[in-house]
Each structure stands twice: as C-alpha cells, then as structure tokens.
C-alpha cells in the first residue's frame, strides 16, 4: 500500500468500516469486484483483517515500475519523518515501504539499498529508545539491551560485498560499544581495535573515513587515560597510533567531514592538548 486505505465489510463505501490499512502494510488479494479488491491485510502484531478496499494505491508484482513507486513513497515518508510538522508515524511507514521493495521485488536494483534503509530506520529508532534507558550508561555493552540485528544481518547475508553490507556491518558495531568508559582504558582500547578491524575487513566501505576517525579519537583519549593509570609507555604508543590513524583519515578523505575532524584531532594531539577528560594547563 502506498496510501492509507479504509477496509470495508463489503465492496461498498456505505458498508461497515472495519479499519484502516497503513502505508507499507502487506495485503493479499483474495478476490476482485469491479474497482474493488477483497484483501487480507496484515495490520501488525500478527493481526490480520479481511475485507474490501478500493483498488487504488495497491502495488503488486505486476505493477509497472512497482519497485520505483514503493521506493519513492518510502523516500517521501522518510522526508516527512524528518520534518518538524511531518506526518505522524511517517518513520514507521518508511521502514515498512523500504522493506516491501526488497520483499516484493527482490531482483530490483533498488532492493539492496531499500533493505538497508529499512534496517537503518529500525536501528535508529531502537537506538534512541535504548540509549535513553539507565542501562545505556553501564560500562559493559552486555549489561544493556542491544539493537535488534536481524535486518542488518539480512542485508549482509543477501548482498555480501556491496556497500550496503559494509554499512550494515558498521552499524552493528554500536552493540559492541561500552556505555560509559568510567575512566578506564579497557573500553576505548577494545573499541579502537574494533574500528581498526572494520577498516581492515571493509576497505571499500563508505564508512571507512568515519571508522578511522572513531579509532583515532579513542587512541587519542587513551593518551591521557594511560597517564592516570601510570602507564607512560602505553600512553606514548597510543599517541603514535592516534597520529597515524588521524593522518590516514585526513589524507585519504580530505573532502569529507571526517577528514576535517581528523585534521583537527591531529592538531590537538601534536599540540599536546588533551582530547579526553578534564585536564587543563
């Protein structure tokens, strides 16, 4: 569905209304009657409703350019969700519509991107909720509930070697990050290793610049953290690693925001300005 449709008991607008079918909901056509479709509509939470809807705004496998129509409606819904006075629940509409592109048109050139966008919307919505809970501040990642990885893993499984699979793998790093470092070197050290491993395993990913910066920022933070732990040698080693990572991000991605941020980080490190904690001159 690319519109909100009222579902009726009979193929007549004067008949009893059973409910509404939102954008992106799956409908199975059971019968037709002139300009009407008898459908079984999935309304969420395993709720099914059978009735009649007007044959308008229903995209089927046989619909010409159906994948582009669904994708376009998803993009429009995502735009609505980003607006201050946008349509209510437009983010959920976009999530479902993108998924329908993949589900109904798996061979479409838009399918991989659509599945990733659907997964990303779900990820971001869950992340806002999970990170607002007290458990989000726990030091260890396993002490809090993580975002559901099912759709992200599906992207990686169905479209390996694509940039969408690379981006899905990058998003899943969120579930491995500590909530609060609590001034300990364990978390930033582990996280820097994770980002560096990502760069090594996904060298063509659109997220490489960000991953390099994320690793460099954590290595830079360790410069001061190791000092508080009386580990001067490790502090110097972290400084060298941070400089190397920041230089790589800056030189390889000079036109990106991450490249510029890496250049700033490099400047602070070389100037001896702490990038973590409350250290002052």
Which sequence ranges carry the predicted segments?
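Heptad-repeat amphipathic alpha-helical coiled-coil interaction surface used
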Residues: 95, 102, 118, 125, ...
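Terminal, low-structured helical/coil segments at or just beyond the last alpha-helical repeat
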Residues: 186-191, 235-281
